[in-house]
Structures are given as structure tokens and as C-alpha cells.
């Protein structure tokens, strides 16, 4: 049996960020994820004709300074967020899209 001082449950944005910080600090950890992919609610799905549909965590604004800093540190490029036009917003899976 393997033991660890730190167990991270879930490989969404928070779990992956914690794992990254522990890795940088040279601390051992175990990261568990129930799904066959990482990212949690961050996911780009595609319609039947191939159009991208963002599922969860779709906005990255200038006020998200910590996340922007992390993305920069990791070499992940960002792009201008579209704020005009039409969008479908689903506040919860329990309520209809608006």
C-alpha cells in the first residue's frame, strides 16, 4: 500500500492548481480523478457540425489576475473574450438555459 501526506480529489482547475503548486515545492501528493479526462467543468464540446460549445468556466476576464498569472507561467495563451452578440447562458443544470 502506498501512503501520501496529501491527497487531491478531483482534477478540475483547483485540483490541478494545487497539484502544480505542490510539484513546484517538491512535495509528494496523489491526485485522483473519477473521469477519463482532466479539467473538471472546463470542456469544449462540439455540435454535430463541429462548432465549438464551451461547457463551464467559459469567461476569463481581466480581473482574474491569479488565473491569468498561472496561465502565463505555464505558457498557455489566452484570447480576447467576446462580450457582445448573443449567447446562451445556463446558470445551473437544474434550470433552463437563458
PLM region descriptions:
Residues 1-98:
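FAD-dinucleotide binding site
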Amino acid at each position: 500500500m502506498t501512503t501520501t501526506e496529501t491527497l487531491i480529489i478531483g482534477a478540475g482547475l483547483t485540483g490541478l492548481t494545487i497539484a502544480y503548486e505542490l510539484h513546484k515545492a517538491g512535495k509528494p501528493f496523489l491526485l485522483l480523478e473519477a473521469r477519463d479526462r482532466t479539467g473538471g467543468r472546463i470542456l469544449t464540446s462540439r455540435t454535430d457540425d463541429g462548432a465549438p460549445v464551451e461547457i463551464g468556466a467559459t469567461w476569463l476576464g481581466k480581473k482574474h489576475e491569479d488565473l491569468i498569472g498561472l496561465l502565463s507561467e505555464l505558457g498557455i495563451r489566452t484570447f480576447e473574450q467576446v462580450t457582445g452578440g448573443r449567447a446562451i447562458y445556463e446558470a445551473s443544470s437544474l434550470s433552463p438555459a437563458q
